Amino acid sequence: MLYSLITQLIDQYSFLNVFKYLTFRTGLSMFTSMFVVLLIGTPFIKFFSARKILNPIRDDGPTEHIVKKIGTPTMGGVLILLGLFSGILLWGDLSNYHIWFLLFIVSGFGLLGAYDDYKKIKFKNSSGVSFKFKIISQILIAIVGIYGLTQLSQNTELTNLYFPFFKNLIINLGWFFIPFSIFIIVGSSNAVNLTDGLDGLATVPVILVAACFAFISYVTGNIVFSEYLNIPYLEGMGEVSVFCGSIIGACLGFLWFNAPPAKIFMGDTGSLALGGSLGAIGIITKHEIVLAITGGLFVLEAVSVIIQVFSFKLTGKRIFRMAPIHHHFEKKGWAESTVVIRFWIISIILAMIGLATLKLR
């Protein structure tokens, strides 16, 4: 929006040329998003607290959660999305269809998450919408988004699947690209949602993955860097780095209030939207497998739930004391802050491994 206005004035004011640089606008989007969240965060929390928009706590969860977390406002994802939209709408190139695809995904999943949070708050339990309703809704949103992407995209690489470490291993998915993409978006959304169970646990890994993909989208959209790294050159993909900057800034601002002890939780409004957007970014940058590496913590959390469910249904026994796996370690006696920081460390290591795959081919 503001960027579009500035581009019309560049010929008259040469100092505005700096806005042509993606790195500059990525920084602006990050700081704008962070500033917006920090600015409205405190009144937002007070408003939600006054209206009893509070987070329901699982009855079977760790006792400490029932004691310490009850009465904490939820739906902080609204804060994150307001910050994210502020950054990208001001500093993003809105003529780039990748941006509109990502905005559709983050909005669709954010609205679904908000409805889920509303149900939890209204009925004062942690169940929310049914699993069937949530999955079907996520799939439908992803289908519409992917269909729009395939109609708008001029990228011949869109249906290709690239493998890190193997520079010549490329599989054209053909029609299977659509269900594959749906799986990535829905899976990523739910994985982040499952991870969001402790103060700050999901926020920092989301920041790390978004930072990795800010770099990946930048080099993928640069013909010189992409050729040097032997990764596919995708025209216009650099603009996605501005979107990633907005995610980073919004989450950094939110972390100010979500750091232990959390003053607000992002709820499904935030976790479903952020997870869905990361999945969508992985798809359009053609780094889906790298997404699974950098976001390995989210994968671990999701897999722990799948293992727990299947084990109990098949044998009647649970592998973990509680799933997702972060609750397992709490049940073993780890302090919440210990679990969070150690999981952050794991996420940092995975992010570095993911970035290393760009060169190790």
UniProtKB/Swiss-Prot annotation:
GO terms for molecular function: metal ion binding; phospho-N-acetylmuramoyl-pentapeptide-transferase activity; UDP-N-acetylmuramoyl-L-alanyl-D-glutamyl-meso-2,6-diaminopimelyl-D-alanyl-D-alanine:undecaprenyl-phosphate transferase activity. Keywords: Cell cycle, Cell division, Cell inner membrane, Cell membrane, Cell shape, Cell wall biogenesis/degradation, Magnesium, Membrane, Metal-binding, Peptidoglycan synthesis, Transferase, Transmembrane, Transmembrane helix. One of its GO terms (cellular component) is plasma membrane. Its cofactor is Mg(2+). The chain crosses the membrane at residues 28-48, 70-90, 94-114, 129-149, 169-189, 205-225, 237-257, 264-284, 289-309, 338-358. CDD domains: GT_MraY. It is a multi-pass membrane protein. One of its GO terms (biological process) is cell wall organization. It is found in: Cell inner membrane. Its EC number is 2.7.8.13. Its main location: membrane. It catalyses: UDP-N-acetyl-alpha-D-muramoyl-L-alanyl-gamma-D-glutamyl-meso-2,6-diaminopimeloyl-D-alanyl-D-alanine + di-trans,octa-cis-undecaprenyl phosphate = di-trans,octa-cis-undecaprenyl diphospho-N-acetyl-alpha-D-muramoyl-L-alanyl-D-glutamyl-meso-2,6-diaminopimeloyl-D-alanyl-D-alanine + UMP. Pathway: Cell wall biogenesis; peptidoglycan biosynthesis. It is an enzyme of class 2 (transferase). It holds the Pfam family Glycos_transf_4. InterPro entries: Glycosyl_transferase_4, PNAcMuramoyl-5peptid_Trfase, PNAcMuramoyl-5peptid_Trfase_CS. Catalyzes the initial step of the lipid cycle reactions in the biosynthesis of the cell wall peptidoglycan: transfers peptidoglycan precursor phospho-MurNAc-pentapeptide from UDP-MurNAc-pentapeptide onto the lipid carrier undecaprenyl phosphate, yielding undecaprenyl-pyrophosphoryl-MurNAc-pentapeptide, known as lipid I. Belongs to the glycosyltransferase 4 family. MraY subfamily. NCBIfam families: mraY (TIGR00445). This is Phospho-N-acetylmuramoyl-pentapeptide-transferase. It comes from Pelagibacter ubique (strain HTCC1062).
